[in-house]
Amino acid sequence: MARYTDARCRLCRREGTKLYLKGDRCYSPRCAVDRRPAPPGQHTPSRRKVTEFGIQLREKQKVRRIYGVLESQFRNYFHKAERQPGVTGENLLRLLELRLDNVIYRLGLGASRAEARQLVRHGHFKVNGRKVDIPSYQVRVGDVIAVRERSKGLTRIQELLDRASENNPPAWLEYDGERAVARVVALPTRENIDIPVREQLVVELYSR
């Protein structure tokens, strides 16, 4: 599968805001957006006035990059959100939030969504007692997510378990740090999806 392999900090600088793609580094003085807020490039030109289409495109790219999905995947999520009842933009964010890799990140079991995605691919988690190694797997209300027993002895997993025990997950997730088990207790609402995007602009872009 195709994936982005260039420096992730360039993406944040391109969007002009932190997308929190590098985990702990994004909260440190080493963050590229704090050090060099101008767009990437040799001459780092100042940001020019953009058209309405350009604004919508940048917002779509921002959402796509935050969750780490390809354009074709993102378009499929949008069409699925369109078919669901309710507000399309909120439906889109909900579908992205319910990806297994994002849930692992929200639980604190990955320092970034990229790390969470890698851990899922390596088969470190179970959903309802069965190993799931598909990052895009859609969890549902009532699903139980757990770290596999054979993975708990790994140094990095132990570090993340300690991290998760101090993490404050969103209201739609419950986490038992002693057992390293989480449960999806509700569907995420826009109020508890804390990403700095204007999803309505994405809807307007795809509605052109």
Curated annotation (Swiss-Prot):
Domain of life: Bacteria
GO annotations of cellular component type: small ribosomal subunit
UniProtKB keywords: Ribonucleoprotein, Ribosomal protein, RNA-binding, rRNA-binding
Pfam families to which the protein is assigned, alphabetical: Ribosomal_S4, S4
tRNA-binding is among the record's keywords: no
SUPFAM superfamilies assigned: Alpha-L RNA-binding motif (SSF55174)
Family: Belongs to the universal ribosomal protein uS4 family.
Complexes and interactors: Part of the 30S ribosomal subunit. Contacts protein S5. The interaction surface between S4 and S5 is involved in control of translational fidelity.
Cited function: One of the primary rRNA binding proteins, it binds directly to 16S rRNA where it nucleates assembly of the body of the 30S subunit. With S5 and S12 plays an important role in translational accuracy.
Name the UniProt record assigns to this protein: Small ribosomal subunit protein uS4
